[in-house]
Regions:
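Flexible, glycine/threonine-enriched loop-and-boundary segments that flank and lead into catalytic domains
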Residues: 105, 465-496
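Short coil/turn connectors at secondary-structure junctions
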Residues: 120, 128, 491-492, 503
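Extended hydrophobic-aromatic, low-complexity segments
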Residues: 505-507, 519
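Conserved helicase core region in the C-terminal RecA-like lobe
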Residues: 494-501, 508
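N-terminal non-catalytic structural scaffold regions of very large proteins
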Residues: 1-467, 473, 512-626
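Structural and coupling elements of P-loop NTPases
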Residues: 82, 501-504
Length: 626
């Protein structure tokens, strides 16, 4: 193949990647067709089956276990499917084991047809070529925010957003007490954070205080020498040798109280060291009506279910259903990754439900934020938004279909006597609900569209499109200006130019030329690493939140033959701000001037000479050329 000639001023450091690889790789990892059924990773369709099965009957007499699945190749090729007006699908067969008392019945059950992706990253549904648009949505994880109270004070809060399940919000009130809201609709149902922490594992005041602050055991003599005496508070009530109460719990020490301890011959006392203005959790404990875990559970149940009589067992079940049941609450791998990253935790990514450490560390971070009036999170930043590709979108729908099937299987199990003969998996499983959900997704979902076939560019753009609309996303009526606007974190990830004019402006966008999606769904863009002032050809892909901490030079910065910057100062970016900086500070460099824009925009000649509005029209109109 003859070598392509380049008339540009800059050499290409990195080849343009496979532009439809996003679609193909996503669906490949969803189906895992090339992997042996016994060696498949716990992802995609395999993960959904592992989540739902094994299923146990109510009387524990029958257990239905999932073993593996296979997908047969399509009976007709793509061209014949289009010609005959049928779907390009493969038959999904699943191996199940049914255990009835001591007997085991093995059977392969057909769950219907599942659409297969063509080599072009499309699907053939009823003879028509369709594309599934990737969805840009708010990432699971934790988000710190601030709102201004009517009195003018700034109230800090955080939200823990799961992939599936109830949101949780924790917020300071006007009196500097920390309250937790478990119900977004009924915000009056709030209770102190200490009540919730006590209910989920921090049973005593000492447990809570030692996790949030530093506890020291000190003698009265040591206290008299302490410089910051007012920073010490009692953890528990202090009694004299004859049992008389000397100092109540949570009391701030002063010289008179230390003298009282010394005169009463108290040898040592446990104290919590809290610097001035950081006693928010201590104040919550002092105001907390619940003093034991049982009290805390009853208090939570009383607030959440005001009409029901509170009981400890019911409260435990309610909390388990809301936050500690894998089937109802799932942070997802992404949610756990974001929590670990934001709070400095080291919990495994498989730990996908909330842990008491998550809440304690988040509350500590919130108190620190309140103290230093720190920077809250930007919800429009691409560190807080991720892409759901075709595989993940279909996986979520398959999960819904299988949970419906699960309900039907359990009902059938309860109607069948375990002593009956001839019970097989086929008699228990009705695949209609599962097939129906998949058909509905491809035929009616907002993100499933007829492929734009006007020209090759329109086809390619259609497959690289990102939409903030669709189920679980925004609606065009409620989306404000901020979410539609170009953000500094879009650099090299989302094209700032190519977007529709009209009501969808900013909500539908296109991936930049070199952008790729990482394992967690975050957009990454490539940069050349700068080592000891020399620009190397080593390429690092960075996400938006990682990129912010580096000084990054533009692709057109002049270099000598060895890769050193010629000019003493270089136009570069740091934390989203562009400025001239000394060349010694530069850590990365853009790979190409094209990396900012999408495929369609990159085809506009002399793009920098265009007005942004005209470039937008040009990028869109190229797709209409016949």
């Amino acid at each position: 193949m003859p070598e392509r000639m380049n008339f540009g001023k800059l050499r290409d450091v990195l080849d343009i990647p496979d532009l439809i690889g996003i679609q193909i790789e996503s669906y490949k990892s969803f189906l895992q067709l090339d992997t042996d059924p016994k060696e498949r990773k716990n992802q995609g369709l395999q993960e959904v089956f592992n989540e739902v099965f094994p299923l146990e009957s109510f009387d524990k007499q029958m257990v239905l276990e999932f073993e593996s699945y296979t997908i047969a190749p399509s009976k007709k090729d793509v061209v014949d499917c289009i010609k005959d007006g049928i779907s390009y699908t493969g038959a999904l067969s699943v191996d199940f084991n049914l255990k009835v008392k001591d007997a085991v019945f093995h059977e392969t059950v057909s769950l219907g047809d599942i659409p297969l992706m063509t080599d072009r990253g499309t699907f053939i549904i009823n003879g028509a070529e369709r594309v599934i648009i990737s969805q840009l949505h708010r990432s699971p994880g934790i988000c710190f925010e601030k709102t201004r109270h009517s009195s003018g004070r700034m109230l800090y809060s955080y939200r823990i957003i799961p992939d599936r399940g109830s949101w949780m919000e924790v917020q300071f009130d006007i009196n500097d007490l920390i309250y937790i809201y478990l119900d977004r609709q009924r915000r009056r149902r709030k209770f102190l954070i200490s009540t919730f922490l006590r209910a989920i594992g921090y049973e005593t005041n000492r447990d809570m205080l030692s996790a949030a602050y530093e506890i020291k055991t000190m003698t009265p003599a040591q206290l008299l020498k302490a410089e910051d005496l007012s920073a010490f508070h009692t953890v528990e009530p202090v009694y004299s040798a004859d049992g008389a109460l000397l100092i109540d719990e949570f009391m701030k020490l002063d010289e008179s109280l230390v003298k009282l301890l010394s005169d009463s011959k108290v040898k040592h006392v446990d104290l919590v060291f809290i610097p001035d203005g950081d006693s928010y959790l201590l104040n919550c404990l002092a105001r907390d009506p619940a003093k034991t875990p049982e009290d805390a559970l009853r208090e939570i149940y009383r607030r959440m279910r005001p009409s029901d009589p509170p009981s400890v067992n019911n409260a435990k079940q309610l909390l388990k259903r809301l936050f500690f049941d894998n089937k109802r609450y799932d942070l997802g791998t992404v949610g756990r990754y974001k929590l670990n990253e934001r709070l400095g935790l080291n919990l495994p990514l498989t730990e996908r439900i909330l842990d008491k450490v998550d809440l304690m560390e988040a509350t500590k971070a919130l108190m620190k934020l309140r103290n230093v009036a720190g920077q809250t999170d930007d919800i429009d930043h691409l560190g807080s938004r991720r892409v759901r590709t075709v595989g993940e979108l279909l996986q979520n729908h398959c999960r819904v279909g299988l949970y419906r099937t699960e309900r039907l299987i359990k009902e059938k199990m309860s109607l069948i006597n375990a002593d009956e003969t001839g019970i097989t998996p086929n008699k228990l499983i009705n695949p209609k609900a599962f097939i129906g959900v998949i058909r509905d997704f491809f035929a009616r979902n907002q993100l499933s569209q007829f492929m734009d076939q006007t020209n090759p560019l329109s086809e390619l753009t259609n497959k690289r499109r990102l939409s903030a609309l669709g189920p679980g996303g925004l609606s065009r009526d409620r989306a404000g200006f901020e979410v539609r606007d170009v953000h500094t974190s879009h650099y090299g990830r989302i094209c700032p130019i190519e977007t529709p004019e009209g009501p969808n402006i900013g909500l539908i966008s296109s991936m930049s030329l070199y952008a790729k999606i990482n394992e967690f769904g975050f957009l990454e863009t490539p940069y050349r690493r700068v080592v000891d002032g020399v620009v190397t050809d080593q390429i690092d892909y960075l996400t938006a939140d990682k990129e912010e901490h580096f000084v990054i030079a533009q692709a057109n910065a002049p270099l000598d033959k060895e890769g050193h910057f010629i000019n003493p100062t270089v136009m570069s970016r740091l934390y989203g701000d562009s400025a001239e900086r000394p060349r010694e500070e530069v850590q990365y460099m853009d790979v190409s001037p094209k990396q900012v824009v999408s495929v369609a925009t990159a085809m506009i000649p002399f793009l920098p000479n265009d007005d942004a509005n005209r470039a937008l029209m040009g990028a869109n109109m190229q797709r209409q050329a016949v």
